[in-house]
Amino acid sequence: KATTANAHPHLSNDGRLVLVHNGIIENYQELRRMLEAEGFVFHSETDTETAVHLIDREYKKRGSLEEAVIAGVKQLCGAFAFCIMHKDEPDKIIAVRQNAPLIIGLGQGENFIASDIPAIIGKTRNIIHLADGELAVVRRESVEVKNLNGENVIKPVEEIEFSPDVISKLGYKHFMLKEINEQPDILRKCLANHLPAPDAPISVGDATLNPDVEKIKNICIIACGTSLHAAMYARTLWEEWLQLPVCVEAASEYIYRRNLTDENTLVIGISQSGETADTISAVRQAKEKGAQLLVLTNRPDSSIVRCCDNVVPLNAGIEVSVAATKSYTAQLAALYLLGLYLAEQKSSLDGRVLSEMKRDLLLLPAQTEEILSHSADIQKQARKLCTFRSFVYM
């Protein structure tokens, strides 16, 4: 519930410890009951405040913020990332990650903590990716990474590549409008990487599937949010093209459900950011069951890539806007191409039909440009429709 009391940051009862949080604490209710029984007073309905009081409880026992964070985090279940400060240790921030994205940006006389790279573009090119169960003690001049046993961890510093255009609106009113207009070029790039000519075989880049695709008896596509909509689109096409059962699972359901994934299942995980906790967990679970794995992501430097060798990069570029535009288009194009690739390998589509579909696909960037050229008409319709509270699509 959006209220002032529920808003971050959250404070300990004495106001000396402060915390911000991204994620979900699954066992917060039982911890809250324990803390309330010990006299801690809660002012919000959030799971975040439970973490504040839990770490404060441990700090009062130990007198060390680092030790208190480690002891507190070990009692939490879920997917979360925290930043914590204490008035007694004012020169540092402790950041900790468990199943939620967190990076450290390294600057000169300054360091940054963020959940994703776009937040620090323009500030630094040097970053450290924290792994699950790691914390960083961040000071102005230094960053020290440790595990939850308090042991130092040596982390590689990665240099991120980006164009200055990424953080510029390039004359557009806002990033979403800019990213909508980037879609034709994103489609061209996708097609150039996977289908250079209508008579060429489709390529999936460095990804390698079992050469005997006949061993694939079913396909399961795992995703969340917008990516889940892209997956449902793929299911409609693939079942017709491949003559195989294709299931689409919300990653949050897949990880808790008893499913029949095995070595004859092709499991495809889709995550724009590559940091979607449930999708990463689902991909890991499918890997343990021996499934063939493939991941589609827009972020080749992300966590999901580290748990799967087969990656089809979307190459849509960093998406600053919250609303998915060009990344969703890239997902649709990549899934269409991947479906045609599998159909080629299985010979499940007539050759002439396949060639015609390829030719039509190569026309898509120009057709998208044609649609976007009617921006004045689109704006006129948008102004008319924006007052409606709901839409029914048939």
Segment roles from a protein language model:
Residues 211-363:
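Glycine-rich phosphate-binding loops that contact phosphosugars or nucleotide phosphates
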Residues 198-200, 245-247, 269-273, 368-373:
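Short, flexible loop segments at the rims of nucleotide/cofactor-binding pockets, characterized by
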Residues 14, 124, 216, 264, ...:
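Short, well-ordered alpha-helix to beta-strand connector turns
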Residues 177, 181-182:
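Predominantly extracellular/luminal regions of secreted and cell-surface proteins
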Residues 1-174, 185-217, 351, 369-372, ...:
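Conserved short alpha-helical segments that host acidic/polar catalytic motifs at enzyme active sites
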